[in-house]
Amino acid sequence: MTIYVSTGGYSNLSADKSSEKLIKAGISSIELSGGIYSKDTIDNLCKLEKKAKFQIHNYFPPPKIPFVLNLASQNCDISNLSLRHVDHVLDCCLKLGATHYSFHAGFLCDLEVAELGKKIKKKELYDREKSIDLFLERVFLISKKAENKGIKIMIENNVLSAKSKNEFQENPLLMCDAEECIKIIRQVP
């Protein structure tokens, strides 16, 4: 069994710098997640490829102008940014020899970067069924592109905090409970 350690715990470093720290500590299976933007991150990580195996998670590599990846967004700008980011990630997987790319299920509203992992401010929610349909449509598209590149995709469920549930009085995230996870999983390739 292989256990991957995430670079996400080093939010103040670029992924190549946090990977160097992990490699020095004896960790050679690294999940690239988060960190700060650096235009040379992928090139620098390629230099570490002989010392570590990489997988990529969600919002990596972080873009120069931050946004929240949302594959269920009904906002054309956000959905286009999200899909372009995923296309870039799949290319990064190829460069780094990563065989898997994981991303989170979508959201029923578009979040601000500062809200990630914290209480989400109440806002109008998108229709859940329409967002699920859009998410599935985009997952099919991503899945075909990934398969053509020999990359497997993984969808990670979301976690609804008590604060966000109280704020919205309903669930603004996809795939937080077993029923919805099963419903979506049964429809993906």
Please provide the spans of the model-predicted regions.
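N-terminal pre-domain/capping segments
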Residues: M1-A98, R186
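Aromatic/hydrophobic pocket-lining residues that form the small-molecule binding cavity
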Residues: A15, S82, V86, F135, ...
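Active-site glycine- and acidic-residue-rich loops that bind
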Residues: S33-I36, Y126-E137, K165-C176
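Acidic/histidine-rich catalytic cores of soluble enzymes
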Residues: K53, S143-P189
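Short loop/turn segments at strand-loop or loop-helix junctions that form parts
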Residues: H57-P63, F103-L108, E156-V159
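Surface-exposed, active-site-proximal loop segments in enzymatic domains
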Residues: P63-L81, C109-D127, F168-Q169
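Hydrophobic alpha-helical segments and helix pairs
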Residues: V89-L141, A146-E147
